[in-house]
Amino acid sequence: MKRFAASTVAIVALAMASMTALAAPRTAEEIVGDYQAVANPQLDRSKTEDQAYVKQYMSERQAAELKRAALAKELFELDKGHAMLPAQMTARWRVMATGADSATVKDEIAAVIKVGGPEPLVVAARSANTMLAFRRMQAGRGTFDDAKAAVEELVANHPKDPQSPAALAQLASMADDATVRGAVEARLLAEYPDSRAAKFVKGDIRRRDGVGKPFELSFTEAITGQNVSIESLKGKVVVIDFWATWCGPCVAEMPKLKSLYADWKDKGVEFIGVSLDQPEDKGGLTALKAYVTKESLAWPQYYQGNFWDSDFSVSWGVNSIPAVFVVDADGNLHSTDARGKLEEIVPALLARRDAAAKPAN
C-alpha cells in the first residue's frame, strides 16, 4: 500500500511538473524566432492566370500573415521594449485593419498612444493611426479632415521621425482640392526637404506639370548594351512601362502588353520598359535578363538598379507599379496615367501624327 501511494505521489508530482513546464512563458527570443520562421508561400508566376491557384496562394499568404500577427501580439504582451516589436506590430495592424479585426486594431493602437511606452512603439502606433484614417477615408467612412488630424498628431509628437514626412506625402496625395494638396506639399518640402518623401513629392509635382512638355530619357539597354533615347524615337509614339520582375500585377499584365506591341510595332509605336528591380548585387539584373529572355520581350529595357530608390523613377514620383506613361510622336509627354488606357490613347496619337503629316490641300 505504501509503495502504491509513493508511486501515485511520484506520478502526480511528475504531471504537475510537466504542467508547470508547459505553462512557463516563452522568451522573447523564442517568439521572434517563430515569427521569422513564418514564410510567405512562393508565388508561381506561370500560374497567375489560374484563378484557383491564385485563390489558394492568397489564402496561404493570409494564413502566414495572421500567424505572424498573433506572434507579434505575444511579443507585445511580454516585452514592449523589444527592438523588433514596432515593425512587428505595424505589420499586425496593417494585416488586421480591415474586416472583423478592425475594432481590435483600433483599440490596440489607441491604448498604446494613451498609455505611452517606448518611443519607437508609440511612433508606430501613431503612424498606424494615420493608416487607419486613410483607409476609412478611402472606404467613404472618414473625411480628409479626419486623416489630416491623425497626421498632425503624428507630426506634432514625432517631428524628426521618418514616418512624419511619409504621412504628409500620403495626405497630399489624397487631397482632391489642388490648393489643399499644394499647401501640404509645400509644407513637406519646407520642413523635410531632404527626406525620401520629399523626393517623391517633387517627382509627383513634375509628373503633373510635365504633361505636354518634352520628355527626356537616355539609357544603356540592359540586354544589348545599345544606347536608347527618346530623341532618337521622335516620329514614334512611345509607351513607357515602369515595372519589375518581382511585381505580380506587372507580370500579370505582360501578356496584354506583348499583344499590343505585336499589333503596333510596325505602325510607329515603341515600348520601353523601366525596371525597378533590385540592385545588381541582389540579383536584380540577372532576374530582369532571365525574364526578358524567357518571355521574349522585344522592346528595350532600362535597368535602373536601385529598386524603389532608382533615380529616374523617383524623379517622376513613381511610388507604385505598374505605371505607364505615353510620349507622343513629337517627343512630348502625353500621359502619366495610361495604365489600362493604351488602346484608347495610342491609336488617337497615331491618327493625330498621321493627320499632321498629310500635306495641306
Model-derived features with residue positions:
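N-proximal helix/coil linker or "cap" segments that precede and/or mark the start of modular domains
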Residues: 173-220, 231-234, 281, 286-293, ...
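Short solvent-exposed coil/turn linkers within tandem alpha-helical repeat scaffolds
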Residues: 77-88, 98-103, 112-128, 137-142, ...
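N-terminal leader/linker segments that initiate helical-solenoid repeat arrays
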Residues: 23-73, 81-87
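Conserved redox-active cysteine motifs that mediate thiol-disulfide chemistry
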Residues: 234, 242-259, 276-280
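Short, internal strand/loop/helix patches
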Residues: 222, 286-329
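Alpha-helical repeat scaffolds
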Residues: 71-75, 103-116, 142-155, 180-190, ...
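A short beta-strand-turn-helix
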Residues: 219-238, 261-264
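Thiol-/selenol-based redox modules, centered on thioredoxin-like
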Residues: 326-361
